[in-house]
Design a protein with these regions (language model features):
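Glycine/proline-enriched, intrinsically flexible loops and inter-domain linkers
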Residues: 1-242
Length: 242
């Protein structure tokens, strides 16, 4: 943060406030134009899809439906999450930002995944309807320990909804899980409790129309998380990997 503050101050000193803020606006406007142009290439219409999570860990065997509706009108897209499952008793709930974030990830992937930076302009053409009380917008006292599994499924379901309209630009669903294992225990000789996590484990991604999916890759909303080196885990904890 301090480095960013210093560099930004240097830009202001060098070019002046008006020039810097104007450049920022231009960058965001470029991202907006790119997103709108790609959205225009999607046929207007209402697209719907449904996925399921197995259960919430409490009501075993009771599926959690993830239903999305995507409305494309000109250069705008609306993602409606009103019919996603209501929040559940178990820990597969997520806060209100999750529905928005997952919709933004899907929108960015489908409109301008690599050619323009991610900023506010990237999402000006996107509206998200996310009423409270759902697994993507849970309210107190809903448990949220495994919140991160929900947005991956939402992204895949948005792709699924739009697959008939833009089959060349979507992939089939991926493994959509952190693959994370948390271990805890007591070390008698040292008199201490240990709690550790393996970090994200890669899995398989769905294929595109033109090529197979990638393997051993982290899930779509976990690109900023690093796994734990085996050597470090075996040194710090009474764990042996094979």
């Amino acid at each position: 943060v301090r480095t960013g503050e210093r560099r930004f101050s240097e830009l202001l000193d060098r070019y002046g406030q008006d020039e810097v803020l104007g450049a920022i606006d231009d960058i965001m406007d470029q991202s907006e134009r790119a997103a709108r142009e790609r959205t225009l290439s999607i046929p207007d219409g209402t697209y719907e899809a449904e996925s399921f999570m197995d259960d919430d860990g409490v009501d075993i065997g009771k599926h959690i439906p993830i239903r999305v509706k995507v409305i494309v009108a000109g250069d705008r897209m609306t993602v409606d999450l009103s019919n996603v499952s209501k929040q559940v008793r178990g820990f597969y709930n997520s806060g209100p930002t999750t529905g928005y974030g997952a919709s933004q990830v899907a929108f960015k992937c489908l409109t301008s995944p690599t050619d323009y930076p991610i900023n506010d302009g990237s999402f000006r053409a996107l509206e998200v309807i996310n009423p409270p009380g759902r697994v993507v917008s849970a309210v107190r006292p809903a448990p949220m320990r495994s919140w991160m599994t929900i947005p991956m499924t939402v992204v895949d379901t948005i792709f699924k909804a739009l697959a008939p309209a833009i089959p060349d630009r979507v992939i089939a669903g991926h493994f959509a899980d952190l693959g994370n294992a948390t271990m805890f225990g007591f070390v008698p000789d040292e008199g201490r409790m240990i709690i550790t996590s393996t970090g994200p484990i890669g899995g398989g991604w769905g294929a595109k129309k033109t090529e197979d999916g990638v393997s051993a890759t982290v899930c779509i909303n976990d690109g900023d998380t690093h796994n734990s080196p085996v050597e470090l885990m075996e040194t710090k904890y009474p764990i042996v990997y094979e």
